[in-house]
Amino acid sequence: KRVKFVKKLEKDSLLSADIFINCSPLGSNLKKKYLKKSPLTTDQFQNINKNILIFDIVYKPKRTKLSYQCKNFSIKYVNGLKMNSFQALKALMIISKVYRNYGK
């Protein structure tokens, strides 16, 4: 698969994307200035692959501006709590394997 990391999206960048991962603090409650922000504009949502999955690392608050935008444009969205859970599960699997093999 082809992976592309970008700092700034061009107008039509999301037309061919299958997944968009928000790794910015925009939408989070880390600072007041981030809270009501989104990494994507309404114009970008109008030029987006309708089958894209948007994965947001933000999990506080649970509902962000990005999540509402996705809902309004019928875009699949997963918030940061799920990503955090996936990471915790993977870490648990790794550490469990280490402990099982420790005494051998």
How should each PLM-predicted stretch be described?
Residues 59-62, 75-99:
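Active-site capping/gating segments
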Residues 102-104:
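A short, charged, Gly/Pro-tolerant segment at domain boundaries
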